[in-house]
């Protein structure tokens, strides 16, 4: 019974780490990352569609993203969607593709993104702590049933805390690494 609780706690905690890593891809570093446009939806024949479903998105160099739609009629809709997404650049429509030129990041931009990374890390820690609470609640249910000895219950609480501490330290390391990447000139 307790092993199942640990397994669930680890599975949910792994998902929380994956969400944090995915969120980190939306933060701009010194070089462009095509994931910065992943959340943008384009009006495709009346329905919102992910940008990467209607166009090829490539990083042509360290400061430029090129978006080549599969249908040239989508150029205007893509430009509008990018402007509406407010990602800090204006789209440049050259008739065949939309280019996004990212200016060099200022120290202020880097510090702002590092602060955002810390905030994302804190949200992930809250998620891990909520997962711990759920695991502890499950152990309390087993404790009420008296189907497991008190020593096993104590070990259960200790193991849940060890798992939580492990994931919190992983999050701290991810945030530290991301901050270093963001602040590197």
From Swiss-Prot:
Keywords assigned: Cytoplasm, Protein biosynthesis
GO biological process, one term: cytoplasmic translational termination
This protein's GO CC annotations: cytosol
Coiled-coil intervals, chain numbering: none
GO terms of molecular function: ribosomal large subunit binding
InterPro entries registered for this protein in UniProt: Ribosome_recyc_fac (IPR002661), Ribosome_recyc_fac_dom (IPR023584), RRF_sf (IPR036191)
Localization per record: Cytoplasm
Pfam families: RRF
Superkingdom field: Bacteria
SUPFAM superfamilies: Ribosome recycling factor, RRF
HAMAP family, per database record: RRF (MF_00040)
UniProt family annotation: Belongs to the RRF family.
Cross-referenced PANTHER family: MITOCHONDRIAL RIBOSOME RECYCLING FACTOR PSEUDO 1 (PTHR20982:SF3), RIBOSOME RECYCLING FACTOR (PTHR20982)
The protein's role, per its UniProt record: Responsible for the release of ribosomes from messenger RNA at the termination of protein biosynthesis. May increase the efficiency of translation by recycling ribosomes from one round of translation to another.
Protein name, entry field: Ribosome-recycling factor
The organism of origin for this protein: Campylobacter fetus subsp. fetus (strain 82-40)
